[in-house]
Swiss-Prot record:
Amino acids binding ATP: Q86, G104, E105, G106, K107, T108, D499
Pfam families found in the cross-reference section: P-loop_SecA, SEC-C, SecA_DEAD, SecA_PP_bind, SecA_SW
Cofactor(s) needed for function: Zn(2+)
Protein name in the entry: Protein translocase subunit SecA
GO term, biological process aspect, one: protein import
Gene assigned in the entry: secA
Binding-site residues, Zn(2+): C894, C896, C905, H906
Organism of this sequence: Rickettsia bellii (strain RML369-C)
A cellular component annotation (GO) from this entry: plasma membrane
GO molecular function terms attached to this record: ATP binding; metal ion binding; protein-exporting ATPase activity
Major location (coarse): membrane
Cellular location(s): Cell inner membrane; Cytoplasm
Amino acid sequence: MFSILKKIFGTANDRTIKKLFSDIAKINSLEPAIQKLSDEELKNKTVEFKKKLKNGATLDDIAYEAFAVVREASRRVYGMRHFDVQLIGGLVLHRGMITEMRTGEGKTLVATLPAYLNALAEKGVHVVTVNDYLVSRDSASMGKIYNFLGLSVGCIVAGMTDEAKREAYNSDITYATNNELGFDYLRDNMKYSLQERVLRPFNFAIIDEVDSILIDEARTPLVISGPVNDNSELYGKVDKLVRMLNVSDFEKDEKLKTINLTESGISHVESLLSQADIIKPNSGLYDFENLSLVHYVNQALRAHNMFMIDVDYLVRDGKVMIIDEFTGRVMEGRRYSEGLHQALEAKENVKIQNENQTLASITFQNYFRNYPKLSGMTGTAMTEAPELKDIYNLDVVAVPTHNKVTRRDLDDEIYGSKKEKYDAILKLIKDCYDRGQPVLVGTVSIEKSEEISNVLNKNKIPHKVLNAKFHEQEAFIIAQAGRFKAVTIATNMAGRGTDIMLGGNPEMLIEQIDRKSLTNAAYKEKVNEIKAQTAEEKKQVIAAGGLFVIGTERHESRRIDNQLRGRSGRQGDPGNTKFFLSLDDDLMRIFASERISGVLRTLGLKDGEAIHHPMISRSLEKAQQKVEGHNYEIRKNLLRFDDVMNDQRKIIYEQRTEIIKSKDSYDFLSSTTEELAKKIVLTFMPAGSYREDWDIENLSVELHRTFAIKLDQNLISKNDVTEEEVTKIVIQTADSIYKSKEEAYSPDLMHNAVKYILLTTLDQVWKDHLHSLDHLRQGISLRAYAQKDPLSEYKREAFNLFEHMLNNLKELFIQTVYHFHIDLKHIQKEDISLENKKLQNNMHESREDPAFSKYNAGSNLETDLRPVISRINPEDRDPKNPTSWGKVSRNELCPCGSGKKYKYCHGLNE
């Protein structure tokens, strides 16, 4: 019934496309007039559009003409005229939606249309992609079109200076990776002046490979972190003990990816820990004093039993490097959190890096939701359309191809074992190779790609391997995968963003020529030779059937399978795709084994035989849908929790910006002084209480600790004195202390000093707050056992922690302001600035990367704004000797190593 209605009325997507074609007719009607313009007149259209916008026109008012201008500029610069379907893709992007366009349909060129149009508003446009290679390539190639029309183009890649980044972000259109954008946002919110920031306010972003960024990478946060206590020795000891455990000592659930000790396992671990003198004899793993060890044991168990080398990570240059499960690429600089990375380093016997404490973090989900207008493009988005709508409020429009797809997607073949599957794959590759048909073999991990490579080596079939170990050659290898007799093994979707052209990519082959060693004539001859060779090979490859894509197993996500299929059949080229499966494959074994095994037993599968059955295909699709649904729920749940932190982060970042912008910090100082003075006085002199109930001694101590005030005992001895009068005197005395500092150091110097103290204190308490939230998140799921909703509990406690953080901020800020002094012998007035470059230069960022310790970075202000009681470098403190600790902040972890805050440990009686 539903299918009949679809045939009559069409799908919602069909109706959207039909409406868009009427818009395209309007753009096409402008083309003859635009073509008659000279180059200079075409460039002046940009100036004309900007004037219209300033006079009240909207982007939609000029959209059709702007698109026609870009199309003509592209034709003149590159000889490439946007197809009608590319104009549709551009309109979809301009209207803040996601466009699904097949591989080879020219998404890079499509982005020029909305990028140019939206850049006319002079608020900046970000074109986002997944790696530095694509950023450099696309900004250089498409930049010629923008430059022709008088717009500037910037390019952001790793390793650039702040000055270079600022210039790039101030361009009309900026190409950047998602990682660099996210880290620049976090870094900007750790800067000490607006002039030092590199980003402009958020405006419009176009995300290439949008599914990879907004879905595949949504669970991993961007993190700027700093080192905490060194526990590398303990990770090493626990790792040795975990290696001695038996299979019966733990239970693992591959579906949920969890692992837990059994009762016998706990006893075994306790025995091993006792023998190693890590815990006392006869004490238990879950005894209070040993609870911290549970974390180390659990992470070591996960490292040894849930994470595999060359599948989840690899070891390169003595470092454990994470492999992206969706792309097969190495995730440079990223580290697993919560000690898992250290456990993997212990497992692989490489140097164990310190654990990190989060200083700033954000997920891509929340970063990209900062843009008032967001759009994206990819070859595969329809399967994830509900999630993109639900989380990002982005609709997906599938744009028809310019040429009809002639690729044939063949039925899956299912075998009883991996060996039988590999034999069948080998047979097909041999057949294709003998006929000259290029083959792309897609695998789900480095381990699998190397297994296939070994099979081909044994059978003397030449081939290229593309996986995380050969990331540098990625674009070139994948671009030449369509050559005659080429056999390429690729991990998942490595090489996305680079087209596979039948016969080879002549441009990339030309780039390999050593031009310096050739004369101009010889170079031209070589170029013509390459072009002729690739053209001839293209004819041979088409005759052989085009690119044959072989999938070695189904991925957890149907979208990834579709991406692999989409490698073949670009722009109407011929091609074939086929998946080979076995009962040993992870997806089959974990999610669909019982059902499918029953079918195979019924059908009587014999060794070496393949089977095709609709029920098996349906079971596989259901298994994939089940996993997709599970992963979606994880991402959705992550967002619910992250939204709590995101709301708090927005408040802190907005406050931080206001502090930096403020011309006078005295108002905040004055109001906070008044608030704390009232609070302290009422604590020790409660309103309406009797004089004998007043705690004058501790009031004096607290006022001196907070405001550096010595309380006049004669004042308190007056019979008629009230708490209001004492409060008033405290406020006046504190104000006079501040005014005397202004006279001694100058108002400007004091203003900058107070502002700096406020910013550094805010950064410190925010860092501690993030640490507290991390701990809260780790254990909050256990509240479900008490019939409580973990999310509601997290929201409630996170709010309480946030209030506590704000109170700490006020106390620490006031204490520092009233106690510090400036050594004018070592500082000039012009040295008091908030730029603090040394601090910024010591920042490092990662997806859990070792970073910096803020108070070790050093700056003019840090060395010369000395508190009355100096602070000792934490590394120089002896845990057993409190006299070596110097001044310890009440909210710092106690130097004794107890894990408690100082005010609840050795500072309890201060």
